[in-house]
């Protein structure tokens, strides 16, 4: 891959985002090509958010939520896992490698684990090469902002 893969990380506010923050506070090294979006719960991440990320041309997507059984919203991370599995199936059907999408569970105290996960997902994406939909990094950056805006509207609207 001539360019570093662009990874979009959908993170739960209470656990994964806090772990990412801890990784930064601990000055742990992980690839800087990961864009983190904070959600109140991974259960608020809709299939269309994940598909929109791939449509933009990101090379990989990770969803990171609370440990199973530890969701602040009870079953949000379980709903997210089902959505991730459905989107992986859709990706395969449209010719995009399903391994470009993965869900991870971690606690807010696992800053080092967050850094490891980012390295793991980047290492998984590099051999796949850039997304066949990737053509303009500026478009991706602007699109990430739009996904964040749409996600905020979804959350405020109270869907699912």
Regions found by a protein language model. Give the residues of each.
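Iron-sulfur-associated redox domains of electron-transfer enzymes in respiratory
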Residues: 1-160
């Amino acid at each position: 891959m001539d360019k570093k893969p662009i990874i979009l990380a959908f993170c739960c506010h209470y656990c994964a985002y806090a772990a990412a923050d801890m990784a930064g506070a601990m000055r742990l090294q992980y690839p800087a090509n990961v864009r983190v979006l904070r959600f109140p719960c991974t259960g608020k991440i809709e299939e269309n958010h994940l598909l929109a990320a791939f449509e933009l041309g990101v090379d990989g997507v990770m969803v990171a939520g609370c440990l199973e059984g530890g969701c602040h919203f009870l079953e949000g991370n379980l709903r997210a896992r089902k959505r991730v599995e459905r989107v992986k199936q859709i990706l395969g059907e449209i010719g995009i490698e399903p391994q470009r999408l993965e869900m991870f569970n971690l606690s807010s105290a696992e800053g080092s684990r967050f850094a490891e996960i980012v390295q793991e997902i980047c290492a998984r994406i590099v051999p796949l090469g850039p997304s066949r939909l990737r053509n303009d990094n500026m478009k991706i950056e602007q699109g990430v902002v739009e996904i964040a805006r749409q996600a905020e509207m979804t959350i405020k609207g109270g869907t699912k």
